[in-house]
Amino acid sequence: VPLTRYGGGVRLLRTPDDRFENLPGFDFPERYAEIDSQETGIVRIGYVEAGPADGPVVLLLHGEPSWSYLYRKMLPVLADAGIRAIAPDLVGFGRSDKPADVADHTYAAHVEWMRAFAFDALDLRDVTLVGQDWGGLIGLRLVAEHPERFAGVVPANTGLPTGDEGMPDVWWSFHDAVEKAQVLDIGRFVQSGCVTKLTEEERAAYDAPFPNEMYKAGPRAMPSLVPTTPDDPATEANRAARAALGKLSIPMLVAFSDSDPITAGMRPVLERLPGAEGREHPVINDAGHFLQEDGGPRLAVEIASFVRSL
């Protein structure tokens, strides 16, 4: 029986701790922060942190259907560079509380949950955002809406869709596969977005947050929350965020992989933003959608030198 609480009328599930024991390459002490949100009341967010407490802050946001485990190869590299690297789990993922109903997940709620984590609970300032997949869909909104909190931005295989441009066929295949799957094989989905082969133990680590289907409302909800038409509930806010990013001069390093058909079209859009102009933007070669798996240390080195330049 899952550990269940009710917050603001929302049923929240919590993954038992023993699911997270002895995960390969992930021996960071778990930390928790509580946020109070209008949507769900008190929600516990899990995160890991590495590096000196007084170092420049890098906030690493994962996406669908992963969790902070995705950043295990990057955290030590960033920490060794003197950076305070913080990787939270989105609500519904990892060690964070999981609203049990797909309908409890909205784009706006995810932006608010991460805002409350980063700014209310941890009071982070002069942050460099690193966002991949939904980590960028959420994180770029935070940068646009709270620019005073950010020193730099590193979008990696991500974007800010408004529904005004079409999504690639490969994305629709993923969307439909998630919608139709009776059992959502999280480890398989992560593997399908990697060039390197994950070990069985690594795949199991991606399955760890979800003991059964009941826990998977987050991964089930996310594809349908991406704005794909101009009348999507998040379109207006994302258009406003894009307009804001078009006026902000916060330094931006666009760090995409060479083999991600899902997000490749967003790279030129981001590189045209004022914060990205006149900068050498790295390409992480031999890496798929989950470039943290395929080229994590290389991406971390690029981020560290970018942070040093700020």
Give, region by region, the residue ranges found by the protein language model.
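Helix-rich cap/lid subdomain of alpha/beta-hydrolase
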Residues: 162-222, 226, 230-234, 239
